Amino acid sequence: MGLKKACLTVLCLIVFCFGIFYTFDRVNQGERNAVSLLKEKLFNEEGEPVNLIFCYTILQMKVAERIMAQHPGERFYVVLMSENRNEKYDYYFNQIKDKAERAYFFHLPYGLNKSFNFIPTMAELKVKSMLLPKVKRIYLASLEKVSIAAFLSTYPDAEIKTFDDGTGNLIQSSSYLGDEFSVNGTIKRNFARMMIGDWSIAKTRNASDEHYTIFKGLKNIMDDGRRKMTYLPLFDASELKTGDETGGTVRILLGSPDKEMKEISEKAAKNFKIQYVAPHPRQTYGLSGVTTLNSPYVIEDYILREIKKNPHTRYEIYTFFSGAALTMKDFPNVHVYALKPASLPEDYWLKPVYALFTQSGIPILTFDDKN
């Protein structure tokens, strides 16, 4: 134990000396500056405990914002970790940043598991976890992320609350049902163990005493009788005033972050006479033959605004496997369709997603993607 503490002390010194604390952080606009954390740890440790919320996607930030709204007056620190940084991520991060006491954006352009990135980032996370004031609750969706375990292992007595990360919470083959973190390489695995001890995915899952779900009426993998399940609707269309669909039809394809979907997406757009594509927040490629909707909003927020402006327009939303199909299917004047390429084998991994769509009343449209 003494050796472990000594190693951790040396690690802290290295982190300070080499500037991993981003004291003069320009790329992240000071969001990873630890000086304020250090000051609070030294001079205000007896203050009110804080709640931590970890996010990896825009959807998770939306859920986190709703959770925070349910606890007015409490202190919240938000930690966003992402390989992506674009207009959408910045917009929603700034939204939640305005509502949190502190917010940190860890932009990891090469991914955490890259050898040159893993050790310094895990070191930074562990040291910063120890600089936090007393932690009351920890909220997270991505149970499989070893980076969050750096904080969980530092505060084993904190309450753990989990929330949905899209359709991954509705599929039995989800990585959230695993036991151990996936860390490639012996050196990285050993370093991870030094940072998180015996913490695991299973330990996080079993410690969760409440789970927030955004999907009503669908079986959730976290609904196993061990915890309270709380429904948390994300998008409210109840106050929209709409009329008959006499204002024309707007067809929108939901983009995919996977580049191999480019050709199939273009064929689908042509086949169904789709005019627009709403890029996925992590999408880096464009599609020919359709107009790209450039907006800082995720598709649900975008459509709600469009319905308000054009209450007589019919909106047709086409998707291959986006969870947004489930969150938008009950919007007024919105008709959602799931696309299934004819070449897709019966045992393809998307089969459970299509089953979800069918269960939710979303039509499945098969098309010839080879011609």
Curated annotation (Swiss-Prot):
InterPro entries: Glyco_transf_52. It catalyses: a beta-D-galactosyl-(1->4)-N-acetyl-beta-D-glucosaminyl derivative + CMP-N-acetyl-beta-neuraminate = an N-acetyl-alpha-neuraminyl-(2->3)-beta-D-galactosyl-(1->4)-N-acetyl-beta-D-glucosaminyl derivative + CMP + H(+). The active site is at 258 (proton acceptor), 280 (proton donor). GO terms for cellular component: cell outer membrane. Keywords: Cell outer membrane, Glycosyltransferase, Lipopolysaccharide biosynthesis, Membrane, Transferase. GO terms for biological process: lipopolysaccharide biosynthetic process. Pfam families: Glyco_transf_52 (PF07922). It is an enzyme of class 2 (transferase). Belongs to the glycosyltransferase 52 family. This is N-acetyllactosaminide alpha-2,3-sialyltransferase. It comes from Neisseria meningitidis serogroup B (strain ATCC BAA-335 / MC58).
